[in-house]
Amino acid sequence: MISQINNEERDYKLEAYDYLLDPSLIASKPSAIRHASRLMIVRNSFLEEDCLTNKFTNNLLDEFREGDLVVVNNTKVMKARLKVELENKKLVELLVLERSHECVWLCLAKPAKKLKINRKLKLKSPLEQEINLIVDGVDEETGGRFIKFPENITCLNSMNELLDKYGEIPLPPYIKNSEEDSFHEKSYQTEYATNPGAVAAPTAGLHLSKSLISNLKKKGVIILPITLHVGYGTFKPIDQEDLSNLKLHKEWVSVNKEVVNEIKRIKKTDRKIIAIGTTSVRALESCYSHEINDFIPIAKYVNLVIKPGYKFKVVDGLLTNFHLPKSSLLLLVSAMIGRERLLELYKKAIKEKFRFFSYGDAMYISPDSLLEKK
């Protein structure tokens, strides 16, 4: 009993989500064929074969059943990384996160210390006219800067048009290679990315090729989209050791009526709801209303924290990547199958040379492997 209590206490300590990873296992480019990445299949821990490591993403065709609902995140990564010039001609890098008000947008800056309030910036491109920006304020939560853009940049559509002309795809810092930007503009997007607004890819979806999606549909698997614009809440490093009161930065989520109606229908059958990626999990779980004990369509900012102890209302299974140590994504997956089991599976993945992080291999958490739901 004391051991169980100690384990539960460790579930809420950040250091309990750390692990050692050989840097050579960090993928710098994706699999040449999306559905050819390696796949670890996680089953019920009481089964003799509770973990399969000799599979590929294309084997998901054998895992999903006719009538199962597979939910994908259709957000599209914007070219949200901008290089701006100071008065002294030195460059500063901005990562556009979200609109604050009017034409003012919250951006992460590198190096941020150079961007004092009212400092003027210039946005340049060889083929476009110069644009003047100004530092409008400092955000205490993120350490970012509020940047005033031209007066017409007041919505996601107008910002996306500007970013298409001046910006670059914001790859994670651990992806280091000599590929051209055009390579990542395709490879760092899912095949179904149609809704611009993300500053990072929902990477589990990178494993789904057009042919795999087509074959799943032919089998009778239902595939529907939600939207969660991946932002600071997904990739921000956790900076507190005590996770009991953890808060995440808000992100925009949209789950429409068609998806909600399908959730309600599926829950009355023996079919399962499979989320493609942790962002799809958070979007789906956010559409459950505790007030009315039912599922509802939503279109709003959400900062749902899923960690050990969370009881899943919607999701039965998950396709996900292998995530960074001490990340909120590790907490979410631990809530599904338990922290200790997850870390043991990561040890196994490392031993068998699975590739990690955004361009890496995948893990499928099957419905029978989840901890008890309520």
UniProtKB/Swiss-Prot annotation:
UniProt record, GO biological process: queuosine biosynthetic process; tRNA wobble guanine modification
Catalytic reactions of this protein: 7-aminomethyl-7-carbaguanosine(34) in tRNA + S-adenosyl-L-methionine = epoxyqueuosine(34) in tRNA + adenine + L-methionine + 2 H(+)
Gene3D superfamilies listed in its UniProt record: QueA-like
Pathway: tRNA modification; tRNA-queuosine biosynthesis
Keywords, comma-separated and alphabetical: Cytoplasm, Queuosine biosynthesis, S-adenosyl-L-methionine, Transferase
Protein's UniProt keywords contain RNA-binding: no
One GO molecular-function entry: S-adenosylmethionine:tRNA ribosyltransferase-isomerase activity
Cellular localisation: Cytoplasm
An annotated GO cellular component: cytoplasm
Keyword flag Ligase: no
EC number, as in UniProt: 2.4.99.17
Family designation: Belongs to the QueA family.
Quaternary structure and interacting proteins, as annotated: Monomer.
Function of the protein: Transfers and isomerizes the ribose moiety from AdoMet to the 7-aminomethyl group of 7-deazaguanine (preQ1-tRNA) to give epoxyqueuosine (oQ-tRNA).
Protein name, entry field: S-adenosylmethionine:tRNA ribosyltransferase-isomerase
Origin species: Prochlorococcus marinus (strain AS9601)
Taxonomic path: Bacteria, Bacillati, Cyanobacteriota, Cyanophyceae, Synechococcales
